[in-house]
Amino acid sequence: MPAAIQITECPRDAMQGLHQFIPTELKAAYINLLLQVGFDTIDFGSFVSAKAIPQMQDTADVLQKLDLSNSKSKLLAIVANYRGAEAAAQHPEITYLGFPFSISETFQQRNANSGIDKAFETVKNIYALCDQKNKKLRIYLSMGFGNPYGDEWSVDILLKWADQLVELGVEDMYIADTIGIATPGQITQIMNQLKGYKNIRFGMHLHSTPDTCLEKIEAAYSGSCRLFDTALKGYGGCPMAKDELTGNIATENLIGYLQLQNESLTLNYDKLREAMDFSVRIFG
């Protein structure tokens, strides 16, 4: 497990569920502010079907408006199939391709119109493409803590797919609490199991209500997780969650917790406040 804290800020996840289209210039202005904060990575957009996620149809245009000249942050784009991966891989500015791989058969079918086995074949092809194009592949193990469909779930099932991905060569995986149902006990249990993997970067993409945010952060951190996905003010998250208050882990809550643990964070807090103020123009 990495020793240093690495935060991936996720404006893509925050924005993608909004029904009203956010102008390209406004998206780019917000992300440009985030690029100055000092996050390790920015999950800035996705190369997916415009029909599936209309909000992200301008990702390539947004990318052209980003100023990376004075930013240490890397860019990540989400892809859902090989075609999207090809489109993303054409852009030298992008470091990571992120692929959501569901360990729930039902969710995988609904999300990508293919079963888990077929999705794994897609991962193989995207991994080869990343190797060819000098990109890094990040796998999100969706429904990593259970699912609402009655599909079988266990830590063993999660680890089975993690093992297969490691055998393929994947070195970067985030466990995704897609519908916000993870308990602190589950998080601790899974983190303890993941400690057995050597030279693999495991992170957490957690969703929560405001009331459960800190306990989930604490469980992950106490279990040696140092890689976190977050979004300012907890925007975005879980359209399928039963509780409409369920969203992404709020970046400012994670930062506050880490400061209490005396973690050294090399962030520009003035730019962070500026980005938080600006976010109202997008999210209201």
Residue ranges of predicted features:
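Catalytic cores and adjacent flexible loops of soluble metabolic enzymes
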Residues: M1-G284
